Amino acid sequence: MRSDLQVSRLFTDINEPLPKQAELFGFSLSWELDYVNIFDILESWEIPIRAKNRCGKNYPIIFGGGPVFTANPEPFADFFDVILLGDGENLLGYFIEAYKEVRGAEKQVQLKRLSQVPGVYIPSLYEVTYEGTNGAIKSIEPIDKDIPAVLQKQTYRGNSLSASTVVTEKAAWENIFMVEVVRSCPEMCRFCLASYLTLPFRSASLEGSLIPAIAKGLTVTKRLGLLGASVTQHPEFESLLDYLSQSKYDDIRLSIASVRTNTVTEKLAKILANRDTKSITIAIESGSDRLRRIINKKLENEEIIQAAINAKAGGLKGIKFYGMVGLPGEESEDLDATLEMILTLKKAVPGLRLSLGCSTFVPKSHTPFQWFGVNYRSEKRLKFLEKNLRSKGIDFRPESYKWSVIQGLISRGDRRLSF
């Protein structure tokens, strides 16, 4: 907390006192398709959407941060004055300190000063040239010699990670206090933004961060969520489980992010079941060992089956699997392998509720698969899985192919999307 700032937040269910004239107006974006909410909010505040139209009046500086902006800020360049690249723990403070130095200055002076902060990108101070009208980006050059030619995203090296500041029934995860257990992922699947964008893999200190945060959060809610791309690979995860197994936490409901199959033990399943968790989630991507080797998903079908057996033995009622179609190298035989694996699972763990949520591969910047496109065959492949799994009593939940295409445009697009 800083005593030199007055911070107001926008919610759907409560109102905090809002300033008559905001100086800084910030957004954090974790998913490409949330972009529409940004425009809605700006319009509701009668703030012009495009940065070039915010020069005539005393409009706030519009800034953005989070994984979507860090991965590829260019589609948002025409709408934002400032984009913060990387982890915000330290970067946000440096940004505010620089702004205080030029608080009363003209906007162009403010932006030039802010451009000197490592990790701060001012899109209007850079000129983009392309290889022809519809070609690739040829260069992104500063318009002035005093503007940094190269920007470096910022990486937080501490061992105290984030936790919820708001708990509400209106959130995506209703009334859950979320605690970030790890950041990044050591597995390095070739499609995964969470691995490559947020390197290195970091874990929160058990005694210094996790336990104090959990204790505080459980004073306002009885629902706890452990967040991270690879939660069960925290080096002290067993100790964390032991802490949450204490009798004083018998009445809490524990939720956990997607876990790796080789960490699904009967002990883990029992603890989750005793904390009112009905199921766990495992990202398998495909039932094909061959395709998983291509994408560097270090996982075998035997491990998936054993994880399901352990989950049932520990008292869980179901498993949710994440899958993907349209991955580079995917053939029709790989879809058949997914069907076969799911049906084998159904026989191996009768009574365990199985569901498969399946999305279309979307290329992400900074990953080895960033140069692949969205496979136009993906929509038919989703329908193929849907037809053959639902007829066998498997809960199949496909994501919209059309929205995946839009997500891919934002993930790999540039400023021309705003023309």
Residue ranges and their predicted role:
Residues 3-11:
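A short beta-strand-loop structural module common to alpha/beta enzyme folds
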Residues 11-140, 364-414:
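Glycine-rich beta-alpha loop elements in corrinoid/cobalamin-binding modules
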Residues 11-20, 63-65, 69-71, 92, ...:
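Structured alpha-helical segments in the cores of large, soluble enzyme domains
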Residues 33, 210-318, 325-355:
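Conserved SAM/AdoMet-binding glycine-rich loop
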Residues 42, 78-80, 99-100, 196, ...:
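Short secondary-structure boundary/capping segments
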Residues 123, 129-178:
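N-terminal [4Fe-4S]-dependent radical SAM core
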Residues 127-131, 235, 267-268, 290-295, ...:
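Flexible glycine/acidic-rich beta-alpha junction loops that bind and position SAM and/or redox cofactors
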Residues 171-206:
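Canonical Radical SAM [4Fe-4S] cluster-binding loop centered on the CxxxCxxC motif
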